[in-house]
């Protein structure tokens, strides 16, 4: 394992949809800082766009505690749509549930454990596989040991 701080470019990271070179190769790194270079834009137009996007997000994604999107979108489809059509919205395990706003988000109701999240992840994967023949791939990384209970 290389110790120390390294400067990596966008190309070094090998970014792809919901992935990077380091994620694919399972090389643990910690990103301490990132610099983004963008084009020039009107400051007020940028603020207006940010406001519009924030308002849209409030209407389409849960605002409570969650870890964001749980599953990657399969080619030609949307994980949230598949989960919703499979009846997963509101599905609960312990202190966690699939969001009623967007089914690809699992929300914590204050006392959820990692096992509660895992229970819902497996339940969602199973139901989507049974109904649509699609294997949902995790967007998140699981840390720890989990057991199937169903």
Indicate residue ranges for each PLM-predicted region:
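Phosphate/pyrophosphate- and phosphate-bearing ligand-binding catalytic cores of soluble enzymes
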Residues: 2-119, 126, 131, 135-150
């Amino acid at each position: 394992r290389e110790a120390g701080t390294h400067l990596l470019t966008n190309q070094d990271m090998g970014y792809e949809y919901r992935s990077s070179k380091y994620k694919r190769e399972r090389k643990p790194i910690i990103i301490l800082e990132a610099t983004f270079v963008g084009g020039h834009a009107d400051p007020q137009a940028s603020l207006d766009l940010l406001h519009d996007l924030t308002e849209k997000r409030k209407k389409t994604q849960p605002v409570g505690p969650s870890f964001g999107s749980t599953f990657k979108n399969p080619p030609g489809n949307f994980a949230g749509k598949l989960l919703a059509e499979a009846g997963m919205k509101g599905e609960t395990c312990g202190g966690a549930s699939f969001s009623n706003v967007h089914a690809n988000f699992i929300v914590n109701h204050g006392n959820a454990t990692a096992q509660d999240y895992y229970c819902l992840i497996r339940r969602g994967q199973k139901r989507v596989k049974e109904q649509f023949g699609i294997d949902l791939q995790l967007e998140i990384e699981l840390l720890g040991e989990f057991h199937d209970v169903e």
